[in-house]
Amino acid sequence: MTDLSPVLTIDGPSGAGKGTVSRIVAARLGWHYLDSGALYRAVGVAASWADLDVSDPAALVRCTFDTKVEFDDAGEAGLRVLVNGADATGELRLETTGALASAIAAIPEVRSALKERQRAFRRAPGLVADGRDMGTVIFPDAAYKVFLTASAEERAGRRHKQLMEKGVPVIFDDLLREIMARDARDAQRVVAPLRPAEDAVLIDTSGMGIEDVVQRVVGLLAGRTPS
């Protein structure tokens, strides 16, 4: 039986703030949270552990079906992710994992294999789904849709600050190039390209604090009745 619990989709490019905003909004609403990017990153980690060739789609599709991914939801603090029983949380956020996940996400069979896994997160009292095609492909019937964006420079700056605070040495220009390259891949892929849903509310988060964005998103829900 199909679960018709309400869904809020928050899509956008890498670094727009959707992950942090989605976790906080879900915690405040008391709803479940889906980090769809973590699923693709988890497959990327599994592929890396198995030393698979990223240019071998068949092997990556098999890896997708064989990989068991478990989430330990810590609310606003984020997620602990287990890949085939092993803690992969640290590796999930590496830039190399993100690049691998982006390449894997371009494979139609991988996206198809993960589609139902993502939809299974929809259950009462509601779901906040964070990703790149949540409002267009996974939950096109979602009652609430938001698309967060920001300039590539702004997003690179945020990531640079985040990594430096963690003691990870990184060059801003390298991050900017990686973000721009990923934007191009995500927008140009044949299957589920990155774009806002026609009925999504667009929010440019440039210059905005996280709490400002959270309040705006929560305010959108408060001001609307699910269709």
From Swiss-Prot:
Would you identify the family this protein belongs to, as annotated?
Belongs to the cytidylate kinase family. Type 1 subfamily.
> Which reaction(s) does the protein catalyse, per the Swiss-Prot or TrEMBL entry?
CMP + ATP = CDP + ADP; dCMP + ATP = dCDP + ADP
Record lineage:
Bacteria, Pseudomonadati, Pseudomonadota, Gammaproteobacteria, Lysobacterales
Q: Does the keyword Cytoplasm apply?
A: yes
Where it sits in the cell: the answer is: Cytoplasm
Q: Name one GO molecular function term.
A: ATP binding
Protein name (Swiss-Prot/TrEMBL): Cytidylate kinase
GO biological-process terms attached to the record: pyrimidine nucleotide metabolic process
- Keywords tagged on the record: ATP-binding, Cytoplasm, Kinase, Nucleotide-binding, Transferase
Residues at which ATP binds: 12-20
- Chain's gene name: cmk
> What GO cellular component entries does it have?
cytoplasm
Top-level taxonomic group = Bacteria
User: EC annotation?
Assistant: 2.7.4.25
Name the InterPro entries for this protein. Cytidylate_kin (IPR003136), Cytidylate_kinase_dom (IPR011994), P-loop_NTPase (IPR027417)
Q: Which SUPFAM superfamilies match?
A: P-loop containing nucleoside triphosphate hydrolases
